[in-house]
């Protein structure tokens, strides 16, 4: 993104991003599992904007688009973006039917059309390339600290607080409930978290993400956050919940007594984790 911003400044253009939805793996069979996106389109757009990108274009990726040759893709760019000044991609960029085009192909297309081109090498850290694939693996493993180190920010859930069963309130641990089912899910379980409200105020807490096996179970997963300080908001509040550390997997308890004892232990552990942040 920095290279794109710099190129835009050099050419008097706007820094824009062209991205696809759904992910091409959901349209073009590869024999592998679908790629699960870390964030939905609206959050990706917000993150691009926060990093200085002025325009975000979402292109619907379908079979017709997947069938374009590299030259046909170039024609698409010329028609869609008649004032295009330059393109920035990763060095391992592939495009066109059956991935027929690569960074070298695109560089030639850019030369033929008078566009600038830059292929940016991937960043290496911790003995490997920083990539969305690597970040997804860290999320699935519950390694929130390494994810944050590589991504430059904590992984977070976003949404609006909804009403719940209010069971937590009866055992001394009221929660703020967020229905949340991203494509790329972290493990079900308990996390030390930091909740940020719509005004930007942060609250430390502990959260359970899962399907409530101890109290009847849920069809869709729920993120239930207990805050260590009483918030002045409730249902309807737009919040962000940052995952700081995975504490333990979700488990089923025979009754409320051991569940309550475990929640207290989880709170103590989360406070210990958060005090070191």
Q: What do these predicted regions represent?
A:
Residues 1, 164-277:
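Phosphate/ribose-recognition catalytic cores of enzymes acting on nucleotide-derived substrates
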Residues 2-32:
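ATP-dependent adenylation/pyrophosphate-handling site
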Residues 14-16, 85, 116:
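Residues at the starts of beta-strands that form the adenosine-phosphate
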Residues 17, 58, 119-120:
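A structural preference for short, hydrophobic beta-strand core positions in alpha/beta folds
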Residues 22-113:
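N-terminal Rossmann-like or analogous alpha/beta NTP/dinucleotide-binding catalytic cores
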Residues 48, 87, 147, 193, ...:
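Residue-level signal for inorganic ion chemistry
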Residues 110-211:
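Glycine-rich, Lys/Arg-enriched anion-binding loops that position phosphate/diphosphate groups
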């Amino acid at each position: 993104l920095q290279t794109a911003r710099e190129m835009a400044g050099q050419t008097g253009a706007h820094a824009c991003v062209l991205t696809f939805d759904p992910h091409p793996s959901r349209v073009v069979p590869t024999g592998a599992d679908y790629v699960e996106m870390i964030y939905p389109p609206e959050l990706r757009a917000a993150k691009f904007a926060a990093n200085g990108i002025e325009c975000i274009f979402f292109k619907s990726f379908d079979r017709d688009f997947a069938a374009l040759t590299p030259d046909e893709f170039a024609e698409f760019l010329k028609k869609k973006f008649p004032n295009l000044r330059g393109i920035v991609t990763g060095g391992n960029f592939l495009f066109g039917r059956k991935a027929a085009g690569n960074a070298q192909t695109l560089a030639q297309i850019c030369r033929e059309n008078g566009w600038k081109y830059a292929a940016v090498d991937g960043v290496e850290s911790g003995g490997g390339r920083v990539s969305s694939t690597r970040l997804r693996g860290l999320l699935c493993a519950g390694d929130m600290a390494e994810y944050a180190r590589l991504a430059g920010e904590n992984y977070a859930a976003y949404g609006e607080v909804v009403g719940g069963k209010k069971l937590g309130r009866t055992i001394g641990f009221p929660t703020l409930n967020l229905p949340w089912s991203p494509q790329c899910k972290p493990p079900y379980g308990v996390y030390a978290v930091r909740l940020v409200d719509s005004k930007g105020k942060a609250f430390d807490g502990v959260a359970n993400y899962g399907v409530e096996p101890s109290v009847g179970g849920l069809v869709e997963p729920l993120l239930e956050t207990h805050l260590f300080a009483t918030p002045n908001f409730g249902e309807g509040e737009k919040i962000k919940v940052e995952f700081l550390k995975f504490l333990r997997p979700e488990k089923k308890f025979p009754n409320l007594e051991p569940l309550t004892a475990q929640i207290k232990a989880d709170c103590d552990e989360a406070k210990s984790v958060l005090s070191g942040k």
